[in-house]
Amino acid sequence: MRTTFMAKANEVERKWYVVDAEGQTLGRLASEVASILRGKHKPTFTPHVDTGDHVIIINAEKVHLTGNKLNDKIYYRHTQHPGGLKQRTALEMRTNYPVQMLELAIKGMLPKGRLGRQMSKKLNVYAGAEHPHQAQKPEVYELRG
């Protein structure tokens, strides 16, 4: 009788990938990166084990939003003080906080809980074209579509 393969956390081999966000649509980029962080692209994917790879995203400031979302999409946050609801448009986020904009989109697509927090630590986002992870010898990852 055959048994289903279950990966163990100490047996997982992790690769490093570089993804260029220039000209990419935010949601499509985020869903594919979230899939890499989860490890769903591997044949050894196990839902309860972090089998994902490390992802470096460069050129976050050049990500693309479709339609009129640059002006219409609003990001909300709360300061935890009375009357402390703050809001920013997607245009403000892209010009002032491009890293946070991409991280929010990707983290929203990861599992909620301990495993999702562990997966999100393998995400590195940079606004420009430079990154400090050359020592890891990252592979360039070509997005589908």
Curated annotation (Swiss-Prot):
GO biological process, one term: negative regulation of translation
GO CC annotation: cytosolic large ribosomal subunit
Superkingdom of the source species: Bacteria
GO molecular function list: mRNA binding; structural constituent of ribosome
Keywords carried by this UniProt record: Ribonucleoprotein, Ribosomal protein
Matches recorded under InterPro entries: Ribosomal_uL13 (IPR005822), Ribosomal_uL13_bac-type (IPR005823), Ribosomal_uL13_CS (IPR023563), Ribosomal_uL13_sf (IPR036899)
Subunit structure: Part of the 50S ribosomal subunit.
Task of the protein: This protein is one of the early assembly proteins of the 50S ribosomal subunit, although it is not seen to bind rRNA by itself. It is important during the early stages of 50S assembly.
Xref: NCBIfam families: rplM_bact
Family according to the record: Belongs to the universal ribosomal protein uL13 family.
Name by which UniProt lists this protein: Large ribosomal subunit protein uL13
